Each structure stands twice: as structure tokens, then as C-alpha cells.
Amino acid sequence: MKRSMYAGRVREEHIGTTITLKGWVSRRRDLGGLIFIDLRDREGVMQLVINPEEVSSDVMATAERLRSEYVIEVEGFVEARQQANDKLATGMVELKVSALTILNTAKTTPFEIKDDVEVSDDTRLRYRYLDLRRPEMLENFKLRAKVTHSIRNYLDDLEFIDVETPMLTKSTPEGARDYLVPSRVSQGHFYALPQSPQITKQLLMNAGFDRYYQIVKCFRDEDLRGDRQPEFTQVDLETSFLSEQEIQDIVEGMIAKVMKETKEIDVTLPFPRMSYDVAMNSYGSDKPDTRFEMLLQDLTVTVKGIDFKVFSEAPAVKAIVVKGNADRYSRKDIDKLTEFAKQFGAKGLAWVKVTDGQLAGPVAKFLTAIETELSSQLKLAENDLVLFVADTLEVANNTLGALRNRIAKDLDMIDQSQFNFLWVVDWPMFEWSEEEGRYMSAHHPFTLPTPESAHELEGDLAKVRAIAYDIVLNGYELGGGSLRINQKEMQERMFKALGFTADEANDQFGFLLEAMDYGFPPHGGLAIGLDRFVMLLAGKDNIREVIAFPKNNKASDPMTQAPSLVSENQLEELSLQIESHD
């Protein structure tokens, strides 16, 4: 029989009609000789009623065989329910079954197919096809589909061209580790799976495409966390002849459309702009969460003359004030915060509380001489807790920024209904890598430096600024972009600043440098992490919730057992040999 409609879409207007439904048995109940079935499909749940006095013995026998997750087909008459269930969209109606067929049986599932199920992440991933049956998960992917549909319509209307770029590309330095794919034809050579279509989309601008976009898979072999996966999807844009502001206007319009169509939220345009330096100094993060205050305060000058060398001789002393919550933090709680602070390079965490109008705590006695000034600067009040970090400016900012976010979550200070977008601009071009012992690109080596700082490419790299911009949402980096280098001389200077010899630059990026000999236009763009965006719209804290078949924290798939061993024949074809490092 042909399905008439989705079970979850049956409503009062269908009363009096005969329909056919197909789906899964969510629950079966026997009550007073009647059998009640909750039939589930992707649109919801519908109650079925099987009355032994109104159906054949075969139908009744089939109904008695039903168990959870059996796949069935039913035909019946839609009636009004005697007792409505306002928890269901179909709660005003039920289906009086006249015909029933079992399309497939099911073993007992390893966990219940319902929301808020308590089961380990690896079990969910091992049986992902069952996990995805849960209504909450289905809603996540309906939302994701709406987001991508909205984005495509918006960019199509602006005459962006959707172009697919290669999945098998060249491995290049800078950035995260590549996933490598050995070549059978060119033995000893390897492709790399793209970390982004960065260079190819720039070459499309050189080709005259003017406006490009792609919703594209990317791959990075990096340590995983809640908002990272080894393979992920980004909304990739590139444009020619547009300014930084014009690109940002396009992106803001796209996000506004998505928010309106998926969340019915009217976002305020333009988005606020914040310099990188302000973000780091006031929020302790280059992706600040602006839904709450608790800004970092610089006390370096204030404490300079006190008789406490930990403060007076430190390069920087900064603090955050936890307003009105000192009584929530015992010494044991603060010890836990101290251990947390050490993860970010801090040597420790100093603190005082405001108790009975006075500063109290381990370092209070050292602050007596500046107590009035300190109280005024920090706007202290009764029951405030002040946390200090004395260290380099970088360590103080990073530590207090992390503490700020942790404490806000612990104290439930964040309005989860808010969506605070902002641009972080005026970025440094380079960042120092302790691991590499050199400066590396803060974004990538194709970012255009500001005209005012470009001369420092041959001088102090710490002073070079980039025409780069990140878009931030609620403390997450949603995406990043920049204007790109389009002049060969400037690109060669950039490579040299990063430590490439001319031969190395030509070996790695010769095709790009050659392209710059052929009228490369001014261009720029941006990429937004689609998984992360949908995660935030769905109110989740892990992108696995919005990726159909994600990996676990070990970059493994418990369902398919990927990555897996391959046969000796396959390795031999590729001239590969596995060495043990035991």
C-alpha cells in the first residue's frame, strides 16, 4: 500500500478519513483487551488502536507479535481521541487500525529510542543509526538542512557561483597536520585531503569567477574537542574587487537570513566590531563571549609600589571580579580554580573577598595601602570575589579569560537565549610558536598585511597587522576571513618572513606564484564552520550532535571501526610498509 502521509502530520482535519501509515513501533501497550501502539516516523508519533472486536484474528495475532522498533504498515480510520494528549502534535486524534503488516522485526535495542537517554557517547556512535532515530537528533538535522538551504538561496541570489574544488590536493606547510593519501601511480608521492579550499578558491578569482561559494568538506589531523572533528563542513566564500567592509556586509546579510528563517530572530545589523587587542585585554580571548560582563581589569600600575613582589615585579597583574558570589566559593573551590588556572601557564591564583566592607584573604594584608584605590577601580561591593593573576600579559589574559568563561557557566550567568555576533578585527599577522621556535601565520600565509605595517615583514614581525576578520558567536569562532595577497612580490616577502627560502617557496607554492604573473585581481573572502554554527543554533555543546556520522575523541568511528588495518596486498600496491614503534 502507498503511504498516505507521515504519522506525525495527522491532525483533526483528517478525522473521518482512511489512511495508510508506515513507521516504527515506539511503544506497545495492552489495556482492557485493546492494543495501543505509538507509531513513530520522522515527523512524530501517532497513536494506533487495535480493537479485537473490530479486526480479524490475523490482524490481532500480528499486533500481539509487535515489539519496540518493529517496522510496520497500517491502514485505518482517523478518529478523535477520547482523552487528548497535549504533549503530542497528533494528540487530538488516533488511528483505528483495520489492516496491519510487519515489514521487518528488530532485536532489543541497546538503548531506548527517546530523548534524554542515558548512554555513553561511544555506544551512541556504535549504533548511530539508532541514535539518529531519536526525535531530538532528527530535529538537529532538519535544522541543518534549513540552514544550508537558506545559505544557498542567499548566495545564489547574490550571483555567487557554486564550484566544487578538489579533494585530492597537495600537502603544504603551515596550519594543522594533513591527512595524507598515498598515490598508487606515482609511488612515494602523496595527496593531501584539503584543510580548506584556500588556494583553489583564490585561483578561481584569478580565473574571473568574481564570486564563489561552496559548502565543502575539510580535513584536519588535530587534537579533538567538543567543537572539532577530523572532517568538518564549512561555508566557503571568495570575492573579487570587494573591500573588507563589503565582504562583511554580505556575511552579515547571510547570517541575518539564516537567523530569521531558522530561529525567527531578527538580528541587529551591523554586527559590533572589536579589535583583537581589546578582545584579549578585556575578555582574555580572541573569541569573546559578550553575553555577560566580568571583564578583565589591568592592575599593573595600581600594584606597582606595594610590598608584595609577586605583584609589584610581575610584567602584568590583572583581575576579574565575581560580583556578589564570594560566599559561593570556599577555599576548596578556589583551590580547584587555581589548578584550572595552572593549565594556562599561570603559576598560581591570588584572591580576596569583600567581607563586612573589608578585603579578606591570603593577599589582603599586602593590599592595605591601596585598598581604597583598588576598591574604586574594581567597583567592589559586599560579597565580591577578586581573582588575580600576576605573570606575562599573555598568560594573565589567557588564564583570566578561561576562568571568566568557566565561572560564568558555573554560576549560570549566561542568557542561553541570546545570540551575540561580533567581528574581531585588526589581527596580528603572526604569532610566536614556542614549539616551532619561530613566528607562524596567525591565519594563513596568503593574508594581506595592512599597508601601514607591511614594511615590518623585513623587521619586527610582531608589529605586522593583517587585514583579517573573525566572526564570533557566543564565545565560539564561527568563521574567519581576510583580504588576500594578489601581488607576487608581496607573497614572496610573506614566505620569506615565515622562513621559506626562495626554492622552498617555489617548490611548495610555485603554481600560486606563477598565477600571480597573470593579472591576479584584488580579492578576499571568509569561511564559516557550518557544524559549529548549527551546533549553536540547536543549543548543543558538541558538534557530534549535528554531524550524522562523526568520529569520537580518538578520531575513530566505533560503528565502522575506521580507521582500520588494510591488507598486505593493498600496502604492496602502494609501496608502503608499516613499521612498529613498540
From Swiss-Prot:
Gene3D superfamilies associated with the record: Bira Bifunctional Protein, Domain 2, GAD-like domain, Nucleic acid-binding proteins
Residues that, per the record, bind ATP: R220, D221, E222, Q229, E477, G529, L530, D531, R532
GO biological processes: aspartyl-tRNA aminoacylation
Subcellular location field: Cytoplasm
Enzyme type, top EC level: ligase
Stated family: Belongs to the class-II aminoacyl-tRNA synthetase family. Type 1 subfamily.
HAMAP family xrefs: Asp_tRNA_synth_type1
Protein name from the UniProt record: Aspartate--tRNA ligase
Organism: Streptococcus pyogenes serotype M49 (strain NZ131)
